[in-house]
């Protein structure tokens, strides 16, 4: 399927005025990379829960709701936190921002936990707090609440990271004046194997908004 | 009753992932929702599950929860009278 | 006038019928599909009501002429059936004739098979083959194979607004000239996973649900699939195709309030409706009917009513929720309600909001309670999902 999508885009690449990327941020292997620079590096042995808790504590954010989130939302939340702090947008810009995220495992990590809570006949207590997170877009909801982002939200499920798709989707949003900024990327987690990559597309910025650059930065961790 | 209150505080912190709180931070009369511990509607549902699981109390209407989940003191009182396990 | 994107075909299977005609008849006579659950064994059997599709998996597989031993989740089966109907309705014979895509939404995916075989995955590796159907994308891929679509295939999963977002993406792909034809819609089957999940949220009613009623007790889950065929102006002209209606407006916005609860002001819903009107270049008074999200939960119906009031003021058009007949079909809801919106345009009628008795006291805006014939040119369809994901679509007759 992926090969076909790639081809499809090659056939129809029409580019208008070029857009830019303000910042990139990735989380993987207990490291955080911001605009090519490693800003946090923790022991490889830490689980995602331990790693995310440490990052939360060290960042000095006071947002107790963080601890209630599932791991996919925690990953989404922290990546957006580091990225948006670096971009420092005024709140009226944030309100109009669009979110376009993607991954391959949807909410599988939390689905499993919910399934575990309903599979035992003797101990049948499905958790409402776990069930709420069995949708991949809940993480987008969490960052929308945190940053008061009210623009368009879309979550796509792909076999693998698809820079071209994300690129064209953000371009369409900005060119059709649906948004002035698009928070874009990939957030995927299955147990302790996690990987996030987010970037902010905007009319101005340090990097050119191109497939090659997005792919290069995605591979950077 | 004191033991039950203590147990409730521990359970609530654990079940609702209130990582920033310790048992000593929660007074018996603190409001659990709104300004107090800042719990929300999903937390109320988790508390309903906890009542069932730990004390054999089944609530079927979330509105009942509102009257019970006022504070640790009120909750402990309710559990002491209605518990089946 | 700025035209929207043409709809040339539709297909549907829901608790009130296995094709468009059956659904239409059920709507015209307010025939409900809500009843006791029969295809799934659950301890909640007596305390929930659902909108279940009567056909069993093997019946659907047979009608699709699937070879024996093929593994299709129920979402993939329902989706394949509805999508095939849509293609047939649009009289499409050769997919490869134009650049054709599929945008399908689901939230349940292959959960029905996973939960059935979960306990044996470790002890009996033979059952592991069912796990391949688990991902959301599997149902989309299966439907694409059934239709022979290879050009562009993707899945959207944004909770209960999923199908509305699939329709929005399809319309955009055509407007941007990237595709000539897109099959858009969604599919979700009932599963223990969703039944138990919604049960713990205490928003399932043990009776037939009563959207927008003052004494509403919660929702009934349902299962369904529906797809629309969207085609570009050029294809319509060249093939001289019959157009059923147009997707003229669409928008999505985030409520930015809570993971599951809607805000008291209905901010996300308000923004979605406002932006959809803007895209369609319409004034609020031009909307003749709103097919509301109307899940019959305390929270949604109040919040949605507030948002509707904010947009339409004292001139709220006829509105109703058809979920009282079909149940809430999650990622299929936006698609089946799109079909109903087009039926409203075709039949020039408004569907009643069944089971309604008393208006919500805070607002006092009652929904339409009687089936009525009237001039219908523009229909708004709302779909709001967990995560604050709110979408509004507008369908127009020309």
Place the predicted regions along the sequence by residue.
Chain A
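Conserved "HGTGT" condensation-loop signature of ketosynthase/thiolase-family condensing enzymes
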Residues: 1-221
């Amino acid at each position: 399927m992926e090969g076909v999508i790639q081809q499809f885009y090659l056939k129809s690449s029409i580019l208008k005025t070029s857009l830019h990327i303000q910042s990139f941020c990735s989380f993987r292997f207990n490291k955080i990379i911001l605009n090519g620079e490693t800003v946090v590096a923790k022991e490889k042995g830490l689980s995602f829960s331990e790693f995310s808790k440490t990052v939360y504590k060290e960042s000095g954010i006071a947002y107790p709701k963080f601890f209630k989130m599932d791991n996919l939302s925690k990953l989404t939340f922290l990546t957006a936190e580091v990225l948006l702090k670096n971009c420092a947008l005024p709140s009226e810009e944030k309100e109009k921002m669009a979110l376009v995220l993607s991954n391959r495992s949807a909410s599988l990590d939390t689905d499993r936990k919910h399934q575990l809570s309903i599979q035992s006949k003797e101990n049948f207590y499905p958790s409402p707090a776990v069930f709420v997170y069995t949708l991949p877009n809940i993480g987008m909801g969490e960052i929308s609440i945190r940053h008061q982002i009210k623009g368009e939200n879309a979550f796509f499920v792909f076999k693998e990271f698809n820079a071209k798709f994300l690129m064209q989707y953000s371009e369409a949003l900005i060119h059709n004046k649906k948004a002035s900024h698009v928070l874009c990327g990939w957030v995927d987690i299955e147990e302790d194997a996690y990987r996030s990559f987010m970037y902010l597309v905007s009319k101005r910025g340090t990097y050119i908004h191109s497939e090659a650059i997005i792919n290069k930065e995605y591979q950077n961790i | 009753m004191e033991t039950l209150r203590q147990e409730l505080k521990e359970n609530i912190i654990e079940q609702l992932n209130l990582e920033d709180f310790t048992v000593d931070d929660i007074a018996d009369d603190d409001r659990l929702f709104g300004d107090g511990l800042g719990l929300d509607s999903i937390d109320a549902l988790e508390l309903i599950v906890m009542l069932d699981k730990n004390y054999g109390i089944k609530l079927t209407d979330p509105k009942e929860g509102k009257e019970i989940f006022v504070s640790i003191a009120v909750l402990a009182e309710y559990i002491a009278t209605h518990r089946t396990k | 006038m700025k035209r929207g994107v043409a709809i040339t075909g539709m297909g549907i299977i829901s608790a009130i019928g296995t094709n468009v005609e059956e659904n239409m008849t059920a709507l015209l006579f307010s025939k409900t599909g809500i009843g006791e659950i029969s295809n799934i064994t659950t301890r909640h059997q007596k305390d929930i009501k659902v909108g279940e599709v009567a056909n069993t998996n093997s019946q659907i597989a047979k009608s699709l002429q699937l070879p024996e031993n093929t593994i299709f989740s129920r979402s993939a089966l329902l989706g394949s059936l509805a999508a095939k109907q849509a293609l047939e309705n649009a009289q499409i014979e050769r997919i490869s004739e134009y650049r054709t895509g599929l945008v399908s939404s689901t939230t349940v995916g292959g959960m029905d098979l996973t939960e059935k075989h979960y306990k044996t995955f470790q002890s009996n590796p033979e059952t592991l083959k069912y796990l391949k159907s688990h991902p959301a994308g599997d149902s989309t891929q299966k439907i694409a194979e059934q239709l022979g679509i290879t050009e562009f295939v993707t899945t959207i999963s944004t909770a209960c607004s999923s199908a509305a977002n699939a329709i929005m993406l399809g319309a955009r792909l055509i407007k941007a000239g990237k595709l000539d034809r897109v099959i858009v819609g969604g599919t979700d089957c009932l599963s223990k996973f969703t039944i138990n999940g919604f049960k713990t949220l205490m928003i399932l009613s043990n009776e037939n649900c009563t959207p927008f009623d003052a004494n509403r007790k919660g929702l009934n889950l349902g299962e369904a699939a529906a797809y629309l065929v969207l085609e570009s102006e050029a294809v319509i002209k060249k093939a001289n195709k019959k157009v059923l209606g147009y997707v003229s407006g669409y928008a999505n916005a985030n409520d930015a309030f809570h993971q599951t609860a809607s805000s008291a002001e209905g901010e996300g819903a308000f923004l979605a409706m406002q932006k959809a009107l803007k895209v369609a270049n319409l004034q609020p008074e031009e909307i003749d009917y709103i097919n509301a999200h109307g899940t019959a939960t305390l929270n949604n119906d109040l919040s949605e009513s507030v948002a509707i009031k904010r947009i339409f003021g004292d001139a709220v058009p006829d509105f109703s929720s058809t979920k009282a007949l079909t149940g809430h079909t999650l990622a299929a809801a936006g698609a089946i309600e799109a079909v109903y919106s087009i039926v409203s345009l075709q039949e020039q009628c408004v569907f009643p909001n069944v089971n309604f008795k008393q208006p919500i006291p805070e607002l006092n805006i009652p929904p339409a309670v009687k089936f009525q014939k009237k001039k219908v040119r523009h229909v708004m369809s709302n779909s709001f999902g967990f995560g604050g994901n709110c979408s509004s679509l507008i369908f127009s007759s020309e």
